[in-house]
Curated annotation (Swiss-Prot):
PANTHER family: BIFUNCTIONAL GLUTAMATE_PROLINE--TRNA LIGASE, PROLYL-TRNA SYNTHETASE. It comes from Saccharolobus islandicus (strain M.16.4 / Kamchatka #3) (Sulfolobus islandicus). PROSITE patterns: AA_TRNA_LIGASE_II. SUPFAM superfamilies: C-terminal domain of ProRS, Class II aaRS ABD-related, Class II aaRS and biotin synthetases. GO terms for molecular function: ATP binding; proline-tRNA ligase activity. GO terms for biological process: prolyl-tRNA aminoacylation. HAMAP family: Pro_tRNA_synth_type3. Its EC number is 6.1.1.15. Homodimer. NCBIfam families: proS_fam_I. GO terms for cellular component: aminoacyl-tRNA synthetase multienzyme complex; cytoplasm. This is Proline--tRNA ligase.
Length: 481
């Protein structure tokens, strides 16, 4: 087996569909509602492992988990006018209860800022109760009219982590935004997902937000995908819902809020970013199975049974040391067929055990990521597997970051930017004066989408690619999902 990435990069959409189906992650396109898929047991375990990382980081930073109803009354959803305007074309509506028309239409939640603020208004009365940080991991529904894609563009987003926080002052809320960004950096670091962090321009902020900060990553085909957002909401939602708290000086005022979300797209990135033509390469931090043992049959039945017994023993040693391991005991498939199955599931390490390993009390270790192999003694296998899993985690992270950085280019000419995007994709940074007019023109002329600008100060000794005035920063542009 050689490492090739032809299908993975040039036919990514087909590759991704094939992996989800054959790897038994996610069954998409066969459930009889467009834009909704089914998590299969193996994929669901990957999802659980990723959620566990997210949940642990939120819990450890003072966030409290809640669970809100799925339905939101129309009159409530419309209280924040900018917000509903941003979502009105995407809302699923419940209009009947049984055979009776409902007096008030009910929305399947597209997001929960309004619903959660409504209850915070009842729960929180004083600055002494702040800051307050809630989160939930739920399904949200968006009536996508564009072509839907498994995990990437869905009508039911099944893994929507949304956090909502309340603060006394604008500055307190801004500090929470900074904390949220750091939490997301840790999440994506654990998932070995590289990213670009940008502030979205004013015309592309979350509906009702003062500021939106977004994490974007580059997929194998060069298109960019948003994987997480953080919003400073200011007093927009508290004001719209007449939510006030008593401040330290005794006066009443609207509190400041933030919200931040991660969705199924983070899981899609984990599956996609480290792949090759044989399937995904899952980071050990979240792989449902970290090690698979494939017994190699002997020439006779007795020898084969002894190999199987030894294989099971090795696997049990690993499981006792908290290394998730399975032994492939299928007697009808050849070793080659088994290799194919476990490669498409992205299992980081394969152990091959045959008569030779049995006779010498050794184990043959094969890495999924770079195909390196090792033969170790039985008593060394646990420590060696731990060492190799750590190496795989770091190597995947390093390679992904190197790949992302290599696909970010600078262009001080609009035609050059357009050519890069048409031929290489990735992200192009162009000098920008900061005006909306020039930003929209950049989008139009490149036939791409503006991602935003760096949140850190970026000195640019160049002219805006549109108006030729001095540039204030760079604007990031990309082909996106």
């Amino acid at each position: 087996m050689q490492i090739t990435r032809e299908k993975w990069s040039k036919n990514f959409s087909e590759w991704f569909d094939w992996v989800l189906r054959e790897g038994e992650f996610y069954d998409y396109g066969r459930y009889p509602v467009k834009g909704m898929g089914v998590w299969m047991p193996y994929g669901f375990k990957l999802r659980q492992n990723i959620i566990s990382i997210i949940r642990n980081l939120l819990d450890s930073t003072g966030h409290e988990e809640v669970l809100f109803p799925l339905l939101i009354p129309e009159d409530l959803l419309s209280r924040e006018s900018t917000h509903i305007k941003g979502f009105e074309e995407e809302v699923f509506w419940v209009t009947k209860g049984g055979s009776e028309d409902l007096d008030v239409k009910l929305a399947l939640r597209p997001t929960s800022e309004v619903a959660i603020t409504t209850m915070e208004n009842l729960w929180l009365k004083s600055y002494k109760q702040l800051p307050k940080k809630y989160y939930q991991i739920v399904s949200v529904f968006r009536y996508e009219t564009k072509a839907t894609r498994p995990m990437i563009r869905l009508r039911e987003i099944t893994t929507f982590k949304e956090a909502h926080t309340v603060h006394e002052t604008y500055d307190d809320a801004q500090r929470q935004v900074e904390e949220a960004i750091e939490i997301y950096k840790k999440i994506f670091n654990n998932l070995t997902i590289p990213y670009v962090l940008s502030e979205r321009p004013e015309w592309d902020r979350f509906a009702g937000a003062l500021h939106t900060y977004a994490f974007d990553t580059i997929m194998p085909d060069g298109k960019v995908m948003q994987i997480g957002t953080v919003h400073h909401l200011g007093q927009n939602f508290s004001r719209a819902l007449d939510f006030k708290i008593q401040k330290k000086d005794g006066s009443l005022d609207y509190p400041h809020q933030t919200s931040y979300g991660i969705s199924d797209r983070a899981i899609a990135s984990v599956i996609a970013i480290h792949g090759d033509d044989h399937g995904p390469i899952l980071p050990p931090s979240v792989a449902p199975i970290k090690v698979v043992v494939v017994p190699i049959p002997a020439k006779n039945e007795e020898g084969t049974q002894q190999v199987m017994k030894y294989s099971i023993e090795i696997c049990e040693m690993l499981n006792k040391n908290n290394i998730t391991c399975v032994t492939d005991q299928d007697t009808e498939k050849t070793p080659g067929e088994k290799f194919y199955i476990w490669e498409i599931k992205g299992v980081p390490i394969r152990l091959e055990i045959g008569p030779r390993e049995l006779a010498s009390s050794t184990v043959f270790i094969k890495r999924r990521d770079n195909l390196k192999s090792y033969t170790v003694k039985k008593e060394e296998v646990v420590n060696k597997v731990k060492e190799v899993l750590n190496e795989i985690q770091e190597d995947l992270r390093k390679r992904a970051w190197e790949s992302l950085k290599s696909r970010i280019e600078y262009a001080n000419d609009i035609e050059k930017a357009k050519n890069i995007l048409e031929n290489n994709s990735g992200i192009v940074e162009v000098p920008w004066c900061g005006s909306k007019e020039c930003g929209l023109k950049i989008e139009e002329l490149t036939n791409a989408r503006v991602l935003g600008y760096p949140i850190e100060d970026r000195k640019v000794n160049d002219k805006c690619v549109i108006c030729k005035m001095n540039a204030k920063t760079v604007l990031r542009v990309a082909k996106t999902y």
